[in-house]
From Swiss-Prot:
MF-aspect GO terms: ATP binding; catalytic activity, acting on a protein; histidine-tRNA ligase activity; transferase activity
Record has Ligase as a keyword: yes
UniProt EC number: 6.1.1.21
UniProt subcellular location: Cytoplasm
Any single biological process term in GO: histidyl-tRNA aminoacylation
Species the sequence originates in: Lactococcus lactis subsp. cremoris (strain MG1363)
Gene coding for it: hisS
Protein name (database record): Histidine--tRNA ligase
GO CC term, one of those recorded: cytoplasm
Protein origin, superkingdom: Bacteria
Protein biosynthesis recorded as keyword: yes
Major localization class: cytoplasm
Catalytic reaction list: tRNA(His) + L-histidine + ATP = L-histidyl-tRNA(His) + AMP + diphosphate + H(+)
Disulfide bonds: none
Keywords linked to the UniProt accession: Aminoacyl-tRNA synthetase, ATP-binding, Cytoplasm, Ligase, Nucleotide-binding, Protein biosynthesis
Length: 430
């Protein structure tokens, strides 16, 4: 049997995980600056949670969800997106309670699963940063979260990221727009794709999100939601735009944007990058004020986004941004002879307890081969430990680049290596 990873998945080897760790560290710092707290939810949940949250007519439910019946007869689905799980956790753990400070600001970094045709930047197991802000409705909340995504792109050095903005209005506005859209699309019903014909009367806004060529041509001239906003929705959107302008965050209005999920209302947005001549969405989200209540929680306004990490890395590579920090090792211990093995183990642990990054040889190779390994690992200092060093307790600590060396004792290293480290680097500091 040939063992290989499932189609649409990827192995992240050490060279790649170093990039991921760098991005995750930057993201964690940005989210912390905005006072968001990390949440971790199960990788699988009840199928109904996702089907109800994302919409029965959405592509996620009809085409992409990984679902199965477990041994207890429960209908389970692998998580296709993070918002539904965060909302479920918010309700189940009573984060809506009056003693909990509002808004509740949550972020996560998690794998998601969708059965899609694998291609560049789109895998069946992919990873997202997600943020959810629950408990307050204010245009400033929307803009703060959009600004947070913008800050993350800037701190990562990603350029050419453009903000696309729209509003879906409140329930009253959407109802008026829904009817206008049905009236417009009905004469074209026979020209629409099969999926769009099915969605026409169930959820006509989904037609605007279609990627089929025949649908794109028809919706190009469809009425815009902006023409059907009531005064409340219009005023809300105007304030969102004014706040973005106050922060010097440029945006364009895309009146056909609806996002791929059914739970959005009012502000929605996407951050888009031109990638090989095509527009690639790297981050998207919006307001979802009815979702908590839809799942029998209290009425709770909310706003959030998801950001694809694989796509972020793909864009960074295209823009020649190096996310791999230079790997260095403080100390490499070259070991010669069986009698030095025990002392090398003790020495390595002692140095690590003193907060130095250490590697040692385990193969009892010739010194030349060990020194080459130290070079490959980027070791700053080398300690050679043989049977003579163990017997006398005298050792030499050598700088791998300058070749400067200091003679000392094993006991001194165990007691405190920092002064020895500083002595070797004294000439560089001066």
């Amino acid at each position: 049997m040939k063992l290989q990873k499932p189609k649409g998945t990827a192995d992240l080897l050490p060279a790649e995980t170093a990039k991921w760790q760098y991005i995750e560290e930057i993201a964690r710092g940005v989210f912390n600056d905005y006072n968001f707290k990390e949440i971790r939810t199960p990788m699988f949940e009840s199928y109904e949670l996702f089907s109800r949250a994302t919409g029965e007519t959405s592509d996620i439910v009809t085409k992409e969800m990984y679902d199965f019946e477990d041994k207890g007869g429960r209908h389970i689905a692998l998580r296709p997106e993070g918002t539904a799980s965060a909302v479920r956790a918010y309700i189940e753990n009573k984060l809506y309670a009056p003693e909990v400070v509002k808004p509740v600001k949550l972020w996560y970094d998690a794998p998601m699963f969708r059965y899609e045709r694998p291609q560049s930047g789109r895998l069946r197991q992919f990873h997202q940063f997600g943020v959810e802000c629950l408990g307050l409705k204010n245009p400033a909340v929307d803009v703060e979260i959009i600004a947070m995504a913008d800050t993350l792109f800037r701190q990562l050095g990603i350029s050419g990221v453009k903000l696309s903005l729209n509003t879906l209005g409140d329930m009253e506005s959407r109802k008026a727009y829904r009817q206008a859209l049905i009236d417009y699309l009905t004469p074209f019903e026979n020209q629409l794709s099969e999926d769009s014909r099915r969605r026409l009367n169930e959820n006509p806004l989904r037609v605007l999100d279609s990627k089929e060529a025949e649908d794109i041509a028809i919706v190009k001239n469809a009425p815009a939601i902006l023409d059907y906003l009531n005064e409340t929705s219009k005023a809300y959107f105007e304030e969102v735009k004014a706040l973005l302008e106050a922060l010097n965050i440029e945006y364009t209005i895309d009146s056909n944007m609806v996002r791929g999920l059914d739970y959005y209302n009012d502000t929605i947005f996407e951050f888009i990058v031109n990638f090989d001549g095509k527009e690639l969405t790297v981050c998207g989200g919006g307001r979802y004020d009815g979702l908590v209540e839809y799942f029998d929680g209290p009425a709770t306004p909310a706003f959030g986004f998801g950001l694809g990490i694989e796509r972020l890395l793909m864009i960074a590579e295209k823009q020649e941004i190096n996310f791999i920090p230079e790997e260095t090792l403080d100390v490499y211990i070259a070991v010669m002879g069986e009698k030095a093995n025990l002392e090398a183990t003790k020495l390595a642990e002692s140095l690590r307890e003193q907060a130095f990054k250490v590697e040692r040889d385990f193969s009892n190779r010739k010194l030349g081969a060990q020194f080459k390994t130290a070079e490959k690992l980027g070791a700053e200092l080398i300690i050679t430990l043989g049977e003579d060093e163990v017997r006398t307790g005298q050792i030499k600590v050598k700088h791998n680049q300058t070749r400067k060396q200091v003679e000392t004792t094993l006991q001194a290293v165990h007691e405190s290596f920092a002064p020895i480290f500083e002595e070797i680097y004294a000439d560089e500091i001066n």
